[in-house]
């Protein structure tokens, strides 16, 4: 028996391995895997159903069909194990060897492997340096290739057509050899000397100057070096032996009715074997060349189809015209091996059912139907029945359970106690889509779900289904309880806000409970406490909303945990006093002494969590829910048609609007306004009418007049049901009420444009046919969009997870000194996001000092929690540097200090936390809420008047940032720099507002001046760009010749004349090379110099510039010499919503990106070409840089102006690659984070910046080597950043020269495919390409990420699996080192001692 056990163990041998290597298989290797050659195409005998000998299912090669039984039946039973039957040749063993025993086919002629031939770039073509077309011609027998030139003038691997070949043959006879087919290619590959090739290419690389040649050489060099280093032989890319898949992996199943269902592979294999056998026969018969050639070509095609059907030519189809599924199709795509079976498997012990409400459950419970529980917990029940001695065998136990005896239910109760189950709702968009609950047995067949977790699951009870999974092992139960229990997931991992928040009925109930009513029954009573308030309410002495005075006892808990109480009389209502009874000790009464809407309740829970911790919050949340439901029921709030009150003002408003529209129509017909203006005005009128009607309706709904105690009339908030629902945030919004009781307003067409006839009716009055039809028009688009959006959002999430899956917190502190700067987001006059909100939960990278002093407020490496943030606020700090994942220095993953607080737990992140996946989920999950639209800016909807002044909103002082200016004769400042910013600073030095100042703005305040709110500080002309003089003097025109370079116009009304500079293209020949300019001279006629330089003040005028001054006029400093009209932005589409987020993460270049200065220096313009201008930047050292810029781009710089690297030269959307190259990593991180946040903020979705930073870190994973130093890298090669870092560290340690590099920004799809792990990349996209590349270069996958480990089927190196992997690595390191000398002596001594002691 013992050896049997050992034998069975031997079958399941799992090697502990650290890496997986992929390579090309040699023919000998394939033969060594094989258990025999498949010689016949037959499968099984149709009469006996036994496999044919030497066929595709042969039992002799692949193993027995039945366990421990040979085919002819001579040997049966276990005792003959391992015997090979002499009659049928079958080894007696288990059937399952048919799943892993392979066979092989000896090919009669070599065949090229289609992946290495056709998967671009063609590896065979690249290696031999022959175009793919030519290789294909050789392979498919259309051309000869010279394999041995001999003493002829032919070259090796030269192509010859049939005729050329015959000519040469006559000329030289058998002096040379030329062949066709895969044999020829195999010979050529076999005769390559890789080392010599490398030498030659390295020499060429040094000598060549052409960029394209260099690129090609580098590519080829990398491939050849890969072949050398991996030990792959190039001729293995040509197959001479074909492996045959084990038969149980390509089954043949008899169906009833004598037909068979078979895997497509069998057809493909059969085809190969038939052709191969025919070819063998033809070769034996020495058939004519043309026949043999045709057969060889057919063999090549059939092998191609087997490996990757449809890659070349038409796909081979089966009987039903459907292309056959080849080996390549088996592994790729959503239905392929990777995504279907390795990354997502179906699991046992699970069930699903419809969900329904469980309002009486506690937060950690769920209701599980008894029937389901009985089925799911069967094994536990069986074992309990057996250990109790209630059933003798498992079979008896099974019978008892099937009969559902009474004792079984008792045991089920016991088994279920404290055994959590997992509930999952598809689609699982973030980790809160699977949570653990303790089951409570219920009658019925629906799972009961706690209402508060619906938000996390995004579940509702309109027929949603959920799946139940049972964690079986003790470890799994422990993890479910400690990590996944719903009570441990109160905060959202995306933003750190509570996600267990009441909604709908509960909110309505609490809102109703905390409202107040004037002159309600019992107003003005004095009550001794909340209990007395409740008594008054229950005995109907006082109404729920009555305003009363109640004695309240508050508990204040200080930081050390000591609590003090204080008691006082408070003005409140009966309802609020009763609600106070369930609020846990330690919260102030003021927090419930207000009308509670959804926002306030969320805040209430947040406060509770931060002040009192998890347990109290969970209990409190449950109490809130029970109370909310109870009072929602008591409130009797419902929706009746009379609750929708239509304001009487509506009809007059509409009549007025119709009158205005009629007027505009008349103006249009008489030609006073254009069609576009008429449309815009009409839409404007209706939009404002709609707003006015809505306002009147809300005023009407939201307040009512009541008589107070003194008998006077007083306004109070209305108790109208619909108003209460919207006001509390339970259901509905002002916009929806507007449609019920106001007017529906303007409708959009599917393309986003607005229909100019609005729907004046509302739903209470009812729509007529036309109005209904207009409504349906836009609504259908909405439904179609939703379906698309779900798929797109899911795909975005998949790409994000794939790129970030291997970011895990691997160490506590990486020791970096870098970080990113954080400032509050300020737009114009308002703070969009406060600094404290951004900094909360981050670690400080540089000491934060008190502004204006050297006093350190917060030392570096402090985790900023709520208390520290309060200090930042109190000391009005407005700029701090915090650590960030982007600047983290860990080689793999990131460190805890750089990540900061784990948002879902509220403390520093634990090691092993899979922060990458969390980041991906947090960004992807709200994706379905984002719109798909690109917004058309056009029409009234959104054309704001162009800004032309800065009006400040706060008192404070002016501060100018990177501004150059001159002071004109009126004493105003005129800005002469580009990217100037005006900020308003309050008395604490905090930034309150930020405004951009264009070139040529005039300021009435100087730097440091005080301003008051409402003052206008700066103004400028909106649609023109001035040219400002920085010196005073007399104007002298240069090259400004009327009719040649300028054209003059005189205004009829004013009599003033102006000149317009003609575009270079439109000038007559004489003016082509002239450069019109305005020069300033002093009274003596000498050039005036620009202050601080030795350059004369000369201003070149671009085309279309308008000059209003005369030659010889006197000008002062800061005067305008000329104006250049700017085209207004026009109707640009802004990409919004989901597509915008995808574009940012894919790092796509915008259509017309902004042009940024590559270097700092002085601008000048060179010779122009037909469509482009030549911009020259002269750097400090005198070297110049040139760039050609299309003429239609508007430039922001003039001749002679100084620019800094990264300044904008021509406006447009900035390309992230440019930002990275010119302004560095911080700038690009900030750019992507802000742009992504912009989209989410519009939808009201809150996501923490660190998630976006985590993704950006992964996008910056690669870098390009600019200078190799003493490293192994090639210049221009793209390498993993961590590799370069490690290599440079080692080089520096040895005192050698490190490599220099530039960081690269990759889009997420590209970054996923460029990952080091080929397993992860192959399971993501483009499986064929990834695997081909990996095999050729003999890649090894160190299984670092999560995905690779899931695929090979072991614990992931994150979370609880992190420790397991760390232990394994430590053990492995120890094994490799071997025992030290000292240890060896100790071991020896111990052994000897043991030997002596046992002798006694």
Swiss-Prot record:
Residues bound to Mg(2+) are: 460, 462, 464
**UniProt entry keywords in alphabetical sequence:** DNA-directed RNA polymerase, Magnesium, Metal-binding, Nucleotidyltransferase, Transcription, Transferase, Zinc
Enzyme's top EC category: transferase
| Alphabetized Gene3D superfamilies for the sequence | 1.10.132.30, 1.10.150.390, 1.10.1790.20, 1.10.40.90, 2.40.40.20, 2.40.50.100, RNA polymerase II, clamp domain (4.10.860.120), RNA polymerase Rpb1, domain 3 (1.10.274.100)
Keyword Nucleus among UniProt keywords? no
Q: Where does Zn(2+) 1 bind?
A: 70, 72, 85, 88
What does the entry list as the binding residues for Zn(2+) 2?
Answer: 814, 888, 895, 898
What does the entry list under GO cellular component? DNA-directed RNA polymerase complex
The GO terms describing molecular function are: DNA binding; DNA-directed RNA polymerase activity; magnesium ion binding; zinc ion binding
Quote the InterPro entries the UniProt record gives.
Answer: DNA-dir_RpoC_beta_prime, DNA-dir_RpoC_beta_prime_bact, RNA_pol_asu, RNA_pol_N, RNA_pol_Rpb1_1, RNA_pol_Rpb1_3, RNA_pol_Rpb1_3_sf, RNA_pol_Rpb1_4
What does the entry comment about cofactor binding? Binds 1 Mg(2+) ion per subunit. Binds 2 Zn(2+) ions per subunit.
Q: How does it assemble?
A: The RNAP catalytic core consists of 2 alpha, 1 beta, 1 beta' and 1 omega subunit. When a sigma factor is associated with the core the holoenzyme is formed, which can initiate transcription.
The name under which this protein is listed is DNA-directed RNA polymerase subunit beta'
* Species name: Vibrio vulnificus (strain YJ016)
Gene name, Swiss-Prot/TrEMBL: rpoC
């Amino acid at each position: 028996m013992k050896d049997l056990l050992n034998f069975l163990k031997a079958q399941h041998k799992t090697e502990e391995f650290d890496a997986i290597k992929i390579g090309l298989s040699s023919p000998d290797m394939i033969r060594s895997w094989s258990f025999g050659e498949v010689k016949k195409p037959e499968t099984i005998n149709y009469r006996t159903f036994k496999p044919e000998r030497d066929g595709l299912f042969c039992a002799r090669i692949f193993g027995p069909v039945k366990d421990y039984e040979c085919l002819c039946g001579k040997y049966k039973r276990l005792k003959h194990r391992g015997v090979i039957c002499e009659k049928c040749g079958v080894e007696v063993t288990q059937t399952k060897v048919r799943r892993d025993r392979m066979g092989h086919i000896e090919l009669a002629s070599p065949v090229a492997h289609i992946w290495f031939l056709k998967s671009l770039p063609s590896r065979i073509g690249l290696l031999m340096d022959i175009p793919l077309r030519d290789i294909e011609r050789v392979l498919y027998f259309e051309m000869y290739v010279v394999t041995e030139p001999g003493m002829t003038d032919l070259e090796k691997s030269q192509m010859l057509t049939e005729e050329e070949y015959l000519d040469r043959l006559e000329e030289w006879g058998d002096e040379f050899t030329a062949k066709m087919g895969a044999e020829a290619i195999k010979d050529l590959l076999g005769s390559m000397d890789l080392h010599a090739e490398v030498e030659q290419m390295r020499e060429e690389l040094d000598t060549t100057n052409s960029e394209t040649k260099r690129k090609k050489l580098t590519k080829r060099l990398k491939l050849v070096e890969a072949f050398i280093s991996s030990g792959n032989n190039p001729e293995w890319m040509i197959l001479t032996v074909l492996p045959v898949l084990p038969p149980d992996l390509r089954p043949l199943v008899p169906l009833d009715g004598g037909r068979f269902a078979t895997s497509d592979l069998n057809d493909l294999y059969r085809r190969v074997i038939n052709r191969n056998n025919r070819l063998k026969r033809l070769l034996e018969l020495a058939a004519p060349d043309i026949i043999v050639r045709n057969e060889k070509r057919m063999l090549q095609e059939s092998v191609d189809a087997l490996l990757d059907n449809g890659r070349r030519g038409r796909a081979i189809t089966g009987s039903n015209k459907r292309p056959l599924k080849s080996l390549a199709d088996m592994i790729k795509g959503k239905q392929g091996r990777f995504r279907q079976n390795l990354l997502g498997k179906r699991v046992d012990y699970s069930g699903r059912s419809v969900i329904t409400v469980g309002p009486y459950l506690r937060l950690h419970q769920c209701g599980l139907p008894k029937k389901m529980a009985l089925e799911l917990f069967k094994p536990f029940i069986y074992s309990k029945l057996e250990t109790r001695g209630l059933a003798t065998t498992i079979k008896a136990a099974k019978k008892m359970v099937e009969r559902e005896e009474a004792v079984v239910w008792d045991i089920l109760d016991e088994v279920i106690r404290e055994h959590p189950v997992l509930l999952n709702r598809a689609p699982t968009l973030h980790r809160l889509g699977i949570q653990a609950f303790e089951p409570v047995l219920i009658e019925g067949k629906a799972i009961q779900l706690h209402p508060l977790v619906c938000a996390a699951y995004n579940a509702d009870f309109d027929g949603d289904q959920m799946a139940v999974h049972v964690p079986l092992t003790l470890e799994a139960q422990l993890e479910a309880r400690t990590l996944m229990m719903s009570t441990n997931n109160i905060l959202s991992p995306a933003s750190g806000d509570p996600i267990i928040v009441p909604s709908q009925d509960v909110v309505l109930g609490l809102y109703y409970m905390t409202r107040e009513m004037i002159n309600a029954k019992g107003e003005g009573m004095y009550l001794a406490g909340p209990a007395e308030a409740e008594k008054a309410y229950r005995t109907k002495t006082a109404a729920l909303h009555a305003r009363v005075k109640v004695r309240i006892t508050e508990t204040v808990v200080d930081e050390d945990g000591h609590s003090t109480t204080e008691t006082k009389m408070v003005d409140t209502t009966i309802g609020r006093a009763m609600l106070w009874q369930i609020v846990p000790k330690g919260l102030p009464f003021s927090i419930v002494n207000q009308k509670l809407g959804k926002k306030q309740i969320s805040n209430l829970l947040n406060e509770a969590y931060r002040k009192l911790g998890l347990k109290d919050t969970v209990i409190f949340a449950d109490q809130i829910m029970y109370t909310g439901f109870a009072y929602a029921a008591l409130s009797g709030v419902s929706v009746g048609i009379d609750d929708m009150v239509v304001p009487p003002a509506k009809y007059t408003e509409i009549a007025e609007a119709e009158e205005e529209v009629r007027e505009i129509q008349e103006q249009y017909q008489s030609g006073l306004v254009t069609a576009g203006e008429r449309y815009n005005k009409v839409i404007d009128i209706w939009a404002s009418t709609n707003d006015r009607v809505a306002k009147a309706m809300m005023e009407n709904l939201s307040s009512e007049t009541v008589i107070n105690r003194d008998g006077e009339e007083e306004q109070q908030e209305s108790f109208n049901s619909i108003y209460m629902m919207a006001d509390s945030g339970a259901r509905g919004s002002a916009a929806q009420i507007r449609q019920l009781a106001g007017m529906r307003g303007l409708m959009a067409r599917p393309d986003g444009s607005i229909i100019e006839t609005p729907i004046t009716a509302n739903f209470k009055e009812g729509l007529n046919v036309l109005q209904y039809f207009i409504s349906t028009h836009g609504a259908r688009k909405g439904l179609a969009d939703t379906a698309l959006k779900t798929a797109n959002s899911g795909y975005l999430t998949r790409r994000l997870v794939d790129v970030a899956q291997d970011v895990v917190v691997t160490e506590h502190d990486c020791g970096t000194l870098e970080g990113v700067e954080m400032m509050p987001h300020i737009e114009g006059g308002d703070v969009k996001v406060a600094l404290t909100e951004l900094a909360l939960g981050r670690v400080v990278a540089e000491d934060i000092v008190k502004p204006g002093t050297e006093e350190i407020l917060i030392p570096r490496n402090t985790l900023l929690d709520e208390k520290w943030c309060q200090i930042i606020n109190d000391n009005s700090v407005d700029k701090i540097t915090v650590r960030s994942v982007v600047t983290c220095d860990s080689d793999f993953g990131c460190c805890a200090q750089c990540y900061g607080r784990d948002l879902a737990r509220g403390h520093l992140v634990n090691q092993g936390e899979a922060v990458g996946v969390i980041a991906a989920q947090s960004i992807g999950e709200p994706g379905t809420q984002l719109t798909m639209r690109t917004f058309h800016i056009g029409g009234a909807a959104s054309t704001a008047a162009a800004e032309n002044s800065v009006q400040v909103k706060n008192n404070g002082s002016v501060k100018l940032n990177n501004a150059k200016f001159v002071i004109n004769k009126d004493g105003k400042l005129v800005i002469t720099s580009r990217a100037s910013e005006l900020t308003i600073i309050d008395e604490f030095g905090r930034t309150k507002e930020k405004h951009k100042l264009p070139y040529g703005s005039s300021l009435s305040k100087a730097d440091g001046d005080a301003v008051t709110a409402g003052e206008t500080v700066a103004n400028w002309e909106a649609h023109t760009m001035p040219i400002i003089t920085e010196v005073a003097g007399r104007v002298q025109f240069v090259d400004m010749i009327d009719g040649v370079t300028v054209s003059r116009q005189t205004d009829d009304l004013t009599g003033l004349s102006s000149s317009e500079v003609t575009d270079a293209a439109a000038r007559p020949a004489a003016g082509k090379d002239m450069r019109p300019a305005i020069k300033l001279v002093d009274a003596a006629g000498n050039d005036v110099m620009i202050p601080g330089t030795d350059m004369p003040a000369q201003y070149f005028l671009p085309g279309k510039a308008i000059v209003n001054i005369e030659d010889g006029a006197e000008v002062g400093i800061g005067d305008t010499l000329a104006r250049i009209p700017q085209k207004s932005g026009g109707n640009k589409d802004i990409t919004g919503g989901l597509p915008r987020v995808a574009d940012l993460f894919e790092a796509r270049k915008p259509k017309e990106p902004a042009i940024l200065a590559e270097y700092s220096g002085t601008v000048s313009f060179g010779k122009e070409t037909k469509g482009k201008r030549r911009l020259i930047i002269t750097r400090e050292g005198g070297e110049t840089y040139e760039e050609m810029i299309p003429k239609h781009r508007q430039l922001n710089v003039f001749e002679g102006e100084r620019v800094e690297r990264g300044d904008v030269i021509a406006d447009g959307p900035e390309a992230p690659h440019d930002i990275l190259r010119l302004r560095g990593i911080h700038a690009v991180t900030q750019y992507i984070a802000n742009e992504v946040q912009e989209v989410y903020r519009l939808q009201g979705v809150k996501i923490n910046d660190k998630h976006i930073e985590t993704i950006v870190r992964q996008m910056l994973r690669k870098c390009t080597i600019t200078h190799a130093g003493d490293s192994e890298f090639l210049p221009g090669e793209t390498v993993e950043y961590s590799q370069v870092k490690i290599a440079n560290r080692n080089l520096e340690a040895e005192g050698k020269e490190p490599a220099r590099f530039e960081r690269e920004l990759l889009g997420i799809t590209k970054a996923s495919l460029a990952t080091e792990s080929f397993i992860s990349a192959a399971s993501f996209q483009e499986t064929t390409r990834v695997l081909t590349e990996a095999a050729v270069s003999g890649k090894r996958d160190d299984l670092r990420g999560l995905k690779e480990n899931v695929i090979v089927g072991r614990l992931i190196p994150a979370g609880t699996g992190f420790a397991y992997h760390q232990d394994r690595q430590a053990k492995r390191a120890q094994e490799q080192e071997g025992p030290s000398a000292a240890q060896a002596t100790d071991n020896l001594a111990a052994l000897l001692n043991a030997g002596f002691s046992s002798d006694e």
